[in-house]
Amino acid sequence: MSNFQRRDFLTGAAAFAAATTATLVGTRRAVADDKPPQPIRGKEGAPIIDPTNPTREAQNVDRLVPPSTDHGTMPNLRFSFADVHNRLQPGGWARQVTGRELQVAQALNCVNMRLKAGAVREMHWHVPDEWGFVLKGRMRITAVDGEGHAFQDDISEGNIWNFPGGIPHSLQGLEGDGCEFLLVFNDGNFNEDATFLVTDFLAHIPKEVLAKNFGVPESAFANIPKEELYIFESQVPGPLDADRVVGAGPVPSTYSHKLMDQKPIETNGGRVRIVDSSNFPAAKMIAAALVEV
């Protein structure tokens, strides 16, 4: 890019940023003055007569008053967790946005989940990979691969994990207020309510088969749940070292990554941390960037 082109680009970008900021500030001021935004841009548009939802319209100004550069049919590029059904369970909840709610999200599915201290998202597995980001609190993640390698780790706000598809795993909130986190699956049509759960699996296997497999009497399975638990309350676990299971040894690649310990790329406008399979080998299907502006 020549100096002239670069100068023009920077000047245009600055003007665009200033105009965008002015629009947002004006909208906030209008809402604060009990003057809801209207679908008017210069000589185009007209005031809303009815129906109207000023609060929602103020949150979606670029949909109500789209930029003049928009052209043709514009798909919805965002969807709020506040608008989806929430699954309430003893010890927590879960809500998801999939390709059903957000049509452009055919490659990714997102779940927002909350676990109280001690509460467990029971051991389960599914076809797509699971990439997780801790929003608040602390949690313990546990998994075992097909070779019997066991994995346990305690992670906190800003940390991430990735379980490859088919790997059985569980999640548990730790002391304090438990945890809240975001899950991402590399399948937009994946359904969090349709995972394979260990309680559901055990409930549909004859007890004599379970007894022979685990080498215990059938009576050991007399009180197993008759249906899935999904999320259930439990006690806060003890220290991580005391909870570790040796199994066949550690997994080949760790399933957790301390993202906030990663040195960020610093710029004049903020910083960014990028995580992909080059610095987190377990995350072969999903890459991400944490951007601070």
Question: Positions of the model-derived regions?
Answer:
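N-terminal secretory signal peptides and thylakoid transit peptides that target proteins
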Residues: M1-A17
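Ligand-binding loop in jelly-roll beta-barrel domains
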Residues: G165-E192
